[in-house]
Regions:
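Gly/Thr-rich phosphate-binding beta-strand-loop-beta motif of the actin/hexokinase/Hsp70
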Residues: 1-34, 53-60, 157-202
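Glycine-rich phosphate-binding/hydrolytic loop that grips phosphoryl groups
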Residues: 157, 288-322
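N-terminal phosphate-binding loop and adjacent alpha-helix
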Residues: 26-51, 77-80
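Glycine-rich phosphate-binding loop plus the immediately following alpha-helix
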Residues: 131-150, 179-225
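Adenine-nucleotide phosphate-binding core of ATP-dependent small-molecule kinases
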Residues: 201-202, 214-261
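Active-site neighborhood for divalent-cation/phosphate handling
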Residues: 63-159, 294
Length: 322
């Protein structure tokens, strides 16, 4: 049976999930997290502990730059690559980038604003960043691909309606989904990074700081006068979430009437009441936790247990949902 290991590398944490099965019915074989900044050693441990030396490994790409463009929808499929290449070269020329130092990939989707066009979401990365990340794995396993998490996260979403997926890791990745495809990704330097740093200054342990964060409960009774009583870390958590909410509001404002659904995932999704908290701050939307679609629920592990490693599950899905 085919299997794949998804690995999401962040500054202070590495999340992993090994999946096996077929495209529409996947099983989580193992999952977990490692804490610290010695990424090379932690990755070696993960590959050994999950017996993944011969499995396909998908890791999140680093330092991705996103661009948007379009091509004519009347083109034949065999001409898509060339049309995107021309559009990409126009972007690199305009921005005075050096294409020989870069790699790019793209996602096509229907253009909501123009039926005669296909929307193109480009992910551009420096070749040196690709090599640096590949060297972390070395000869320990086979790297199937390096994928932007802002694009891969759609692997675990199967909704038919337009939606905004908010993946709150150390940074936050906001993915706009239209017709089942990612059309725009916004990365903001707000997420759990500052929260963990604040907690760690008291706890002096990254792993314990993450556990403290996961046990947080956001107050939702009175949104006009939020009470921080009995929760010393609540102010920094609320401050970070407010910044994320502000970005979501900007996206909704630019796309009036399109997005009515928001999904929260990542470490931030483990904070109790976060979906209700955000829903109360944004008019005319529903907000819920993103449960990974296509994953077989197991008796001893309910689906909600996987939410914290959704980023890794989504990456593993790249190798199994072709």
């Amino acid at each position: 049976m085919a299997s794949a290991l998804g690995i999401f590398i962040d500054r202070n944490i590495i999340k992993y999930a090994k999946l096996n099965g077929t495209k529409d019915k996947l099983k989580v074989e193992s999952y977990g997290m490692k804490y610290g900044q010695n990424h090379k050693e932690l990755l070696k441990q993960i590959i050994e502990e999950t017996n993944s030396a011969k499995s396909n490994v998908v890791i999140n790409a680093s330092e991705i730059h996103y661009e948007e463009t379009s091509i004519f929808s009347m083109l034949k499929k065999k001409d898509y690559d060339k049309a995107v290449e021309v559009a990409y070269e126009e972007i690199t020329d305009r921005q005075k980038l050096r294409p020989e130092l870069l790699e790019y990939g793209y996602i096509l989707s229907k253009d909501p604003a123009d039926p005669e066009k296909l929307h193109v979401l480009l992910g551009i990365q420096e070749k040196t960043a690709i090599e640096t990340r590949a060297n972390l794995i070395g000869q320990n396993a086979n790297i199937y691909s390096q994928m932007p998490i802002g694009i891969s996260i759609v692997n675990i979403y199967n909704g038919a309606l337009p939606a905004i997926i908010v993946n709150i890791e150390e940074d936050t990745y906001i993915t706009e989904v239209f017709n089942g495809e990612p059309v725009r990704v916004t990365r903001i330097g707000t997420g759990t990074k500052n929260i963990i740093s604040t907690i760690n200054s008291e706890e002096n342990s990254i792993s314990k700081s993450y556990e403290v964060l996961r046990n947080m409960v956001l107050p939702i009774d009175d949104m006009d006068q939020i009470s921080f009583e009995g929760n010393e870390y609540a102010p920094v958590i609320v401050s970070e979430i407010m910044k994320i909410v502000s970005e979501i509001k900007n996206i909704i404002k630019k796309n009036t009437g399109i997005y009515r659904k928001i999904y929260i995932t990542g470490t931030g999704a483990t904070i109790s009441n976060i979906e209700t908290f955000i829903e109360k701050l944004i008019d005319d939307v529903e907000c819920e936790i993103l449960k990974p679609s296509g994953i077989e629920e197991q008796k001893r592990t309910p689906i909600k247990e996987y939410v914290d490693v959704n980023s890794a599950i989504a990456l593993a899905g790249e190798a199994l949902r072709i």
